[in-house]
């Protein structure tokens, strides 16, 4: 298990994970939460390690990745093409480097390279990439890039070590620059040091003495940025003034990477700051940094008059932030997308914008609610809400009456030209598109591969975008976390496996709740459980014979058998796949133009395939009856009975009683109902059990027994 590796545990403390897919010769990072392309500079496109592992399966990615930022301590060293076919290091320079840098090392996805992760500081004179004559290469990064993670530990190096990376400078023969780049000094100021200090104090730019728990390095960097502006990037003057500040300490002169900690900090500030102070221009307002106090906010009257100063700065950048008092997380809306993030992630975003990391961020408080029929913001009973629903571009198109011909061909192929079922599905889909509500009915598409089941999902994904979860598998269903249901109109379950009784029970138990309940309980990693209104509608794709148990009285599922392979159809060409996706807008316009028959939205049809599933499900009743009669406790355990303990339906004492009841053949009614409900996935009354299991299969007869001194009705079997 990858999470058992100490290095991965260390990296997992940071919500900087992505997934990646190999496209041609490039590994492209993707957002693990929505499957869209990610950026190594956008924290909203990342997730925690659990979200990344779930996204890896959900979106069919090739692997995991970790994004390096300025706020984490990690440096990534990539040794490319250094392994032979036996996974031995073949390059002398790489062997020497590995002798010096003993930290977490793993084999790269290609199998011929090594990745080393170190906790440390990369010297600024080290070039990011060095190529060698033998075709190998060395790359080093500490921010603005992502690294692939395989978990294939090399040479037992499974932990991240804190090291002095100035050792990289000893590889000069391998074309790594060891000369410090000249510093560009732009000084327009004629003021002396005391005048600069006085000016900074009056402008609220002078730091206070750090307190216990303060991040000294961040305070150093923030003050150095200000000095770069006020001193015109004159490093000597910046250094003299820094030494007079409350931040000065022994670390400032500590030798680091061929220089000193202080010099490196000042050099970074000069590289970061764009403009400088010029007394002749009186351009004090050009300083890119707000005055700050010990809390990281402005230290002047502005703070008292406008506590939301930082919130407004973010608004000018197209970013709206609020604190959700229900989730206890920060909501952030950017580019018409809403995400919930931790305070640390928000601080990282703020740092990228204003060059400092405030400890406190004053923003409005709301409760985020997904309400398609509500305005962007509203208030009810004194509580302020912000709407998390944002229509996609294809949810705002003008209606038309004709469906694109090629989309019609796809649907006819899927439904085997069954006009009635196809009409019901289109009506169901149009209802979701127009009214954005839960229908209470799910559609199951079964049969051969290559019939267009996945293509239909891809088409709908183009229309609904973030309002649709796709490629949810059994692994997701078996997890305690269910973020894929959060604020979704359509959920696609892919390749649902039901090769055993326990799998079918799991799927049925979950689906029964999700399809019919008015609300859902959402569990996400590192977030409070939250109850939300249920808008979910389900499309299930499966190649299994029985994806889910269905009873004769079922009113939840429509089942379609798909046997027409697309490549065998006369109308299909090599361009048809892309042509169908290109007609997503046309199909959206058609859905917008349909006059929905609300009376048929929940209609289900007993198709031949559904009838076969019902018959198979009914045979399970016989199996339950036989297991009861045989007092076969192992059959019940193999078919998921232990789930009653996991769900806290019974306590440990009751669990022992229940098992004993099965093995002795005297089963109290209350336990019999629990047993049958757990196996079938539906709540059953004792009357139903007698009518459907006991009487037809002659399981036993009703009696009265004493339990804990009290008379209890029971069934005697066997």
UniProtKB/Swiss-Prot annotation:
The record marks 146 as: Involved in sugar discrimination to select deoxynucleotides. Changing residue 556 to A: 15x weaker dCTPase activity. The active site is at residues 78, 80, 115, 139. SUPFAM superfamilies: P-loop containing nucleoside triphosphate hydrolases. Keywords: ATP-binding, DNA replication, Helicase, Hydrolase, Multifunctional enzyme, Nucleotide-binding, Transferase, Viral DNA replication. Residues 1-176 are annotated as: Polymerase. It comes from the Viruses. Changing residue 261 to A: Much weaker primase activity. No effect on extension activity. Multifunctional protein with primer synthesis, DNA polymerization, and DNA helicase activities. Recognizes a specific sequence motif 5'-TTTGGTTA-3' and initiates DNA synthesis. This is DNA Primase-polymerase. It comes from Nitratiruptor phage NrS-1. The gene is 28.
